[in-house]
Each structure stands twice: as C-alpha cells, then as structure tokens.
C-alpha cells in the first residue's frame, strides 16, 4: 500500500514499514522451522521496481525525518525486503530452503490506479495484466528451475541486478543493523542471528 501521509499502527510502527517489511520479516522467520521440516521449500518475496530508486535507511526505518513521501517509504521497504531475501538465501542454502525476491512489473491493478493516479493515466495502455504480473511469482514457487537457485532478484523469469542506480548499495553493517532493528520492532529473536 502507498500511503499519502505518515501513519502508525496500534503498536506505533510506521504503516508502510509494518506492512511491507516487518510483516514479511516476522512471518517468514516464524515459518522457517516448518519450511525446513517440509523441504525442499521456497520463500518468494514480491518486491517492486521502485526499490531500484532507494537505499534502505536503517537510521530512519520509521520515516520520522523530513517530509513523508509514501512512494519513497514503499520503495525503501521493498529494498529492505530484497536484502532480507538475500540473507535468508545465505542462511538457508544448506537446509533445502530457497529464497527469491521478484518484481512483477507494472501491472494494471487497483493498487496502481488508486495509489499512483497520474502514473496510471499515462501508462494504463502499456501496463501488464495482473496475470502477467503474477507469472514469475507462480514460476518461482513451482518450477524446477527456480529450485536450483536462491537469493536472486527476478523479473519475467530472469534474474536481474538489484542495483541500477549509484547510492542504493548498503554495507554489511547496515544489513546487520536492519536485521537487528526488525528483530527489536517485531519482538522476534533468532538463536543464531542472520546478519547479512
């Protein structure tokens, strides 16, 4: 969801962070024991092309600094989700659990038309169908080919780079801080912490 104003959950967590990064962090980590028990298994995280424009801001995950911009908050959260996917891929590579992230492309969905009306008006004739946007998600979840890799970022069933603009790379220390801050916000702790 793209919010036009900064809002917080009942727990005091910025809504975009809660929905698009903290919830997948918590849910995936809670499911990992079950995924390991039912291996081979897969984690498929749906990111966004918007993440290409932003770096993760571990110093301001809750977007308290500066003027709030819902598109930027969304892109930052989706960048964080790609980072988490890479961490899970590394940590789970030897236990039969693959982790993938992907960008569905720009699809003609109610979310795009209501959250980005100007963008939608300009691009509606070239947007993908929802089915086209979902194709790579289903392929990553079910195909034999996708089971043979892990930690990649996909678009149209092809691995893609996670960085196209300078200044969007994070350091190993920022990865560790991201994981630690999400643990703190979620109340979940891992015995052997994944640290990016």
Regions inferred by a protein language model and the residue ranges of each:
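C-terminal helical subdomain
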Residues: 77, 123-164, 172-180, 188
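Catalytic loop of short-chain dehydrogenase/reductase
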Residues: 1-10, 14-17, 36-97, 103-122
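A short, exposed helix-loop element centered on a Lys and neighboring polar residues
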Residues: 28-29, 86
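Short alpha-helical functional segments enriched in proximate histidine and acidic residues
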Residues: 24, 34, 91, 185
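Alpha/beta-hydrolase superfamily serine-hydrolase fold, recognizing
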Residues: 2-4, 169-173
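C-terminal helix/juxtamembrane-tail motif
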Residues: 181-196
């Amino acid at each position: 969801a793209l919010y036009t104003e900064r809002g917080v959950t009942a727990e005091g967590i910025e809504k975009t962070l809660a929905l698009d990064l903290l919830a997948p962090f918590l849910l995936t980590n809670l499911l990992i024991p079950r995924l390991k028990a039912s291996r081979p298994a897969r984690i498929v995280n749906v990111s966004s092309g918007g993440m290409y424009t932003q770096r993760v801001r571990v110093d301001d995950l809750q977007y308290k600094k500066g003027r709030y911009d819902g598109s930027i908050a969304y892109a930052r959260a989706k960048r964080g989700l790609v980072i988490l996917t890479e961490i899970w891929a590394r940590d789970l590579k030897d236990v039969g659990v693959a982790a993938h992230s992907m960008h569905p492309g720009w699809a003609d969905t109610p979310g795009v038309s209501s959250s980005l009306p100007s963008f939608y008006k300009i691009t509606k004739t070239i947007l993908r169908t929802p089915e086209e946007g979902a194709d790579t998600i289903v392929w990553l979840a079910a195909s034999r080919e996708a089971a043979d890799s892990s930690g990649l970022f996909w678009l149209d069933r092809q691995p893609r780079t996670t960085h196209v603009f300078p200044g969007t790379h994070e350091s190993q220390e920022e990865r560790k801080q991201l994981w630690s801050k999400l643990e703190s916000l979620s109340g979940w702790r891992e015995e052997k912490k994944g640290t990016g």
